[in-house]
């Protein structure tokens, strides 16, 4: 069985490729390398001793996608490709809506044309907006998303649900992740963004090695124990294993739309993460308090019990191991 992984050279994508290969799947990756590197896939091959078929292509490029589906025997798609920085999405809404929405529509159209109707979609806890309650279950109403990035995820969930309504042969699994951090135990792959990182942990790491001066903590006046934002940080290997569990679930299902939260069920503040990192690397991480970022919320963590019950999946790593 070949699984097409869009955005497979990225942080979560590359870790998912490792888990898929180790579970015995053939993996085909489509990635435009906008915020990733082919080196990640070379390292995936090094870790697993298995081959990854790679196409450098954009999901907006219908011709390129058609060529991939013509050439490869694709059974299912795991769709990661897209722009993903919350803060940047506020300043570049047109790019985010165009890339994420139009790209996914092109992908789904090409899938339909080739009779491939199984997709695991990389969604996000941002679809809950400022959540009505925590811990967040899948029944928590989708809120008003506080940024265009979250809005694209919410809209694409609706698109995929509508596709299923129109054609009951489709199998759709929406995975709403919380905050992925950490790296593969080999140390060969991890989060390696081009330019200044948008996510907390790679930023902290670059401060730790002296690449950046100090960590900017956006807001310390939230209604949380230490005033900084609380998030559910999930190890990327746990998250990757969740995608394999979703593919296995889809193989046995008849069709339909399933939604799962992938998180640990525990919330940690920004300062908790900085202090844990300081402890792990044995040096103080300097930080400075900055104004809140537009689109950020106070508290967000998962109730992951549905994924445990239905996918047989749960997170194993704690914050110290991340």
Write out the residue ranges for each language-model feature.
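Catalytic core of nucleotidyl cyclases, primarily class III adenylyl/guanylyl cyclases
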Residues: 186-188
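Residue-level detector of secondary-structure boundary/capping sites
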Residues: 24, 150-151, 195, 264, ...
